[in-house]
Regions:
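Rossmann-like dinucleotide-binding core of oxidoreductases
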Residues: 52-192, 225, 248, 290, ...
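Single conserved hydrophobic/aromatic residue that forms the stacking wall/gate
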Residues: 1-8, 12-14
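Glycine/threonine-rich phosphate-binding loop and adjacent beta-strand/alpha-helix elements that clamp
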Residues: 256-324
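Ligand-binding pocket scaffold of soluble enzyme catalytic domains
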Residues: 19, 34-62, 229-231, 236
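Short hydrophobic core segments
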Residues: 45-58, 94-97, 232, 240, ...
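A conserved short coil-to-beta-strand element within the FAD-binding core of flavoproteins
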Residues: 16-31, 225-243
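C-terminal active-site-capping segments
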Residues: 311, 315-401
Length: 401
């Protein structure tokens, strides 16, 4: 019954349907002062530690380009971030604008009931099919306990992903050829893979999209969906006119055109009412900010499973708070290191949404612990195994000042 009691206690502490407007660190009292909003209006609460786990993009402000004459379109224009179950795609002609993870996920799902789905892209992304069920996992579970199987399969996937990322960065042409050869095997030699599936950049300069069980390629082969690589001239009443002169008829247009980054979950974070500009600060171990007390944020991997890094971050924050309790101190703060500043952005990615939002994100430094490795093996040592106490992290109480 103990786990059930703990779950109930956690639920009592959870506050759903609350929006955090602002968070101010009060140095005199060593406390975070939060302004939150719920259905009853504004409220104020306090917290001794602030841990942001709201992701890395804005939920309320997606990236929506302004297409010429889009007001002339008579059908629905929908952004996936505002999707709802009332949208009926059955027997409709649908255009999905975009080529990223959202687009390649939506297209095969919608194609099951739609008359036809067109994925309209300005430029292609790398797309790789991946089985939804791991055959090795299925085999090992016949002979081994579930926990051992889970451990082995998890590390198999971690090491394989790390290896593929290493190969892509060091032998990009080889990996590029392998990916394109796999797509040609899926779609046949008569399909124009060079035009529709060959990006202008190298693998892992931007994220590689995974599609489960070749569902996107199956939709293309069955003519339930198609890919058009072109740029948009304007919207018309019944579809989209392209720069090539081609017109795509549509009942619904879905703008899978990307996200907008935010580093602080759209919260106005201040210290004694002075605004915290994340971009002017260094990231400490990829989860704290220089000069900001009792604060952490969860930012995962862009080149592997997001939750691998998120798990490490949660572990570290728990260890940190326990250490503060053990030491009997109120505060911990990464001390700003002027010698660590360089020109390195947090993530070396060329994706449009990263380039648009880098000025919101913290900087990474030129040495540990200010570097963001985006490498699970290195982070295990830096975050999980190494001691929390180091010369860059100051522990203190307000009475010490």
């Amino acid at each position: 019954h103990t786990p059930i009691r703990r779950q109930r206690q956690m639920c009592i502490r959870d506050r759903l349907n609350h929006n955090v407007n602002s968070a101010n660190w009060n140095s005199q009292d060593s406390i975070w002062e939060l302004e939150i909003k719920d259905k009853d209006g504004l409220k104020n609460i306090t917290s001794s530690f602030l841990f942001l786990c709201g992701g890395y993009y804005s939920y309320s402000k997606p990236h929506i380009p302004n297409f010429r004459n889009q007001e002339n379109f008579k059908g629905q224009i929908i952004h996936p971030q505002f999707w709802n179950n009332q949208i009926d795609c059955a027997n409709k002609k649908i255009v999905v604008i975009g080529s990223g993870a959202t687009a390649v996920t939506l297209v095969p799902a919608i194609a099951e009931t739609a008359e036809h789905v067109t994925m309209l892209q300005r430029s292609p992304s790398y797309i790789v099919s991946w089985p939804s069920e791991d055959v090795k996992n299925k085999f090992l579970k016949k002979f081994l306990p579930i926990k051992i199987t889970y451990f082995l399969i998890r590390w198999k996937n971690i090491l394989y992903q790390s290896y593929m990322y290493f190969m892509a960065k060091n032998y990009p042409e080889r990996i590029k050829k392998n990916i394109l050869d796999l797509i040609k095997d899926e779609l046949g030699l008569d399909y124009d893979v060079d035009k529709h599936f060959t990006p202008s950049y190298n693998p892992w300069d931007q994220r590689v999209c995974l599609v489960p069980d070749s569902d996107l390629f199956k939709a293309l082969k069955e003519n339930k969906a198609s890919v058009v690589t072109d740029t948009i001239t304007e919207f018309e009443s019944d579809g989209v006119m392209l720069d090539s002169g081609q017109k795509i008829i549509a009942d619904i247009i879905i703008t899978a055109t990307g996200i907008e980054l935010n580093s602080l979950n759209d919260i106005n974070v201040t210290i004694d009412k002075d605004k915290v500009n994340a971009h002017s600060r260094l990231t400490y171990k990829g989860m704290m900010l220089s000069g900001v007390p009792n604060f952490a944020y969860s930012f995962g991997y862009v080149n592997a499973s997001w939750t691998l890094r998120a798990d490490l971050t949660c572990e570290y924050v728990c260890r940190l708070i326990n250490l503060m309790d053990k030491k009997g101190v109120e505060c911990c703060m990464p001390i700003d290191d002027e010698t660590a500043y360089g020109d390195d952005d947090l993530i070396d990615f060329t994706s449009g949404y990263f380039q648009r939002g880098l000025h919101f994100m913290p900087k990474q430094g030129n040495k540990a612990p200010w570097k963001s490795y985006q490498n699970y093996i290195k982070d295990i040592f830096a975050v999980r195994l190494f001691s929390i106490k180091d010369s860059n992290l100051n522990f203190y109480s307000s009475k010490d000042k």
